[in-house]
């Protein structure tokens, strides 16, 4: 996986 929960939260 390239994105994580924190990556999604930033969006």
Curated annotation (Swiss-Prot):
It comes from the Bacteria. Induction: A fusion of the 5' UTR and initial codons of the gene with lacZ allows expression of beta-galactosidase, suggesting this protein is expressed (at protein level). The start codon of yoaM overlaps with the start codon of nrdB on the other strand. This is Protein YoaM. It comes from Escherichia coli (strain K12).
